[in-house]
Curated annotation (Swiss-Prot):
Major site of localization recorded for this protein: plastid
Purpose of the protein: Produces ATP from ADP in the presence of a proton gradient across the membrane. The alpha chain is a regulatory subunit.
This protein's name: ATP synthase subunit alpha, chloroplastic
Organism: Nymphaea alba (White water-lily)
The reaction(s) this protein catalyses: ATP + H2O + 4 H(+)(in) = ADP + phosphate + 5 H(+)(out)
Amino acid sequence: MVTIRAEEISNIIRERIEQYNREVKIVNTGTVLQVGDGIARIHGLDEVMAGELVEFAEGTIGIALNLESNNVGVVLMGDGLMIQEGSSVKATGRIAQIPVSEAYLGRVINALAKPIDGRGEILASEYRLIESPAPGIISRRSVYEPLQTGLIAIDSMIPIGRGQRELIIGDRQTGKTAVATDTILNQKGQNVICVYVAIGQKASSVAQVVTTFQERGAMEYTIVVAETADSPATLQYLAPYTGAALAEYFMYRQRHTLIIYDDLSKQAQAYRQMSLLLRRPPGREAYPGDVFYLHSRLLERAAKPSSRLGEGSMTALPIVETQSGDVSAYIPTNVISITDGQIFLSADLFNAGIRPAINVGISVSRVGSAAQIKAMKQVAGKLKLELAQFAELEAFAQFASDLDKATQNQLARGQRLRELLKQSQSSPLAVDEQIVTIYTGTNGYLDQLEIGQVKKFIVQLRTHLRTNKPQFQEIISSTKVFTEQAEALLKEAIQEQMELFLLQEQT
């Protein structure tokens, strides 16, 4: 017979009492009333916050956007095919955030910061909210450093500074993405982190951009955030904010960043789709009333912070697509009013073989001139004026039969200047090479050449300067001024090369 020891039993009971942990877990839950088209209607979730993440029984995550009296409208971050009517949903108590780290450089990710390039997981210990407040007025300083795009037309006449928002706007197939990707390629060796956000693009187009970056060695300082045309509207809407959160992470670590949103028209369309399905009242062009706020809160995050916050910056180049050149549509006018200037790409110029097809007359940079280097200001001052006068004369010359000599000379000069601004894709130019090109054109050295010879001569002149007069490049890069010595070197090089070129052309 087993003897029962009272002391042993009391010890076991005491131990169990000490171990007892009365933990009350309160979970805010609800049930699915209806699901479809990327939207779910939930009954319950009484204490859910606007923008809070909710989790469905089968694992799908959603965002609570509409808080109504009898139900909650949730947008799904996935296809939601396994969600059933009547299944449970619980509030997570969190709002959308993503992991951030240096390890994201060189990777292709989706709007949830998950890698989609098949190269394994990305390690990150820090998190950042997708929606962060933009720096306030006191936290900013005015733009003063240049961000070189490598495109002569932009760097000379529509300069961009670090911390600026410059819109790239134009019809489809006018080279908007090409301008943006060339700008990223030109940041090589400039210590600038680039984020390229593709929203609603064809997967083949995104793959092509990524391949270009890899071939040109740009992927090592670039992050690509991609949500293609077949992605849920919620993820297309979130992608720009994910890109902005990653760029901000580097900006607040005193790094210069450049972010490209390609394009915000598609994000607005995704947001319109979500809003209409949530039965929010439609406004102009069926967009919801807060579509301006959608873009303003995104673009205001690009800034040049004050020196108290470090020497970082975040430059944004949003892209907007127009229909038949109509810049007075709702989304284009909204984004034009938010940004610090716009680069307008014209389908007519593109079809005429002028590429990049930048319409210099209506393109403007409101703050960039403060950031332009002195050397560029010195040589590019009269370029815009001469091109504007040429465009006016060209339109007039179509109706006039006999033109005087001065007008003919001005037309000839304008045609050669326009030829100088042509640049093939993925071939950005350094600042000193741009200065050489503009100076040669505006000072009439090309007037004696045929239009077809201009490009060839300029290429040879750049090579001649690089090999025989390297001190020219040293002067420009060290002083940032087009000094008398630099001008003398350039004039000498032009004369030497012109003699050589004319001899070659004669033989």
